[in-house]
């Protein structure tokens, strides 16, 4: 069998890890073992938090819609139910954007929701 030299692949693998560890302090950015552990942990957190971010934004949108709806004497759940009855199909992101940036348009939606309820 021919002799296999893995220097190129090993160097590529280590360079890839050190590139991901760029900016880390001390040995975590220079030493391959420390960098590898830290990068693995960072990637695990990044994966987990990409999922968490979706939940957090949905929660934020609901809070904003609820606050704006309560200014018009509606709770969040009654507001959303009334919008569904009025056949207004807007997602929470758009409703939250209206609540923050265009209160007049949100007031119209609240009025429609009150009529539908």
UniProtKB/Swiss-Prot annotation:
GO terms for biological process: ribosomal large subunit assembly; translation. Gene3D superfamilies: 6.10.160.10, Ribosomal protein L20 (1.10.1900.20). Keywords: Ribonucleoprotein, Ribosomal protein, RNA-binding, rRNA-binding. Signal peptide: none annotated. InterPro entries: Ribosomal_bL20, RIBOSOMAL_L20_CS, Ribosomal_protein_bL20_C. GO terms for cellular component: ribonucleoprotein complex; ribosome. GO terms for molecular function: rRNA binding; structural constituent of ribosome. The keyword Nucleotidyltransferase does not apply. The keyword rRNA-binding applies. PROSITE patterns: RIBOSOMAL_L20. Belongs to the bacterial ribosomal protein bL20 family. PANTHER family: 39S RIBOSOMAL PROTEIN L20 (PTHR10986). Binds directly to 23S ribosomal RNA and is necessary for the in vitro assembly process of the 50S ribosomal subunit. It is not involved in the protein synthesizing functions of that subunit. HAMAP family: Ribosomal_bL20. This is Large ribosomal subunit protein bL20. It comes from Syntrophobacter fumaroxidans (strain DSM 10017 / MPOB). The lineage of its organism: Bacteria, Pseudomonadati, Thermodesulfobacteriota, Syntrophobacteria, Syntrophobacterales. The gene is rplT.
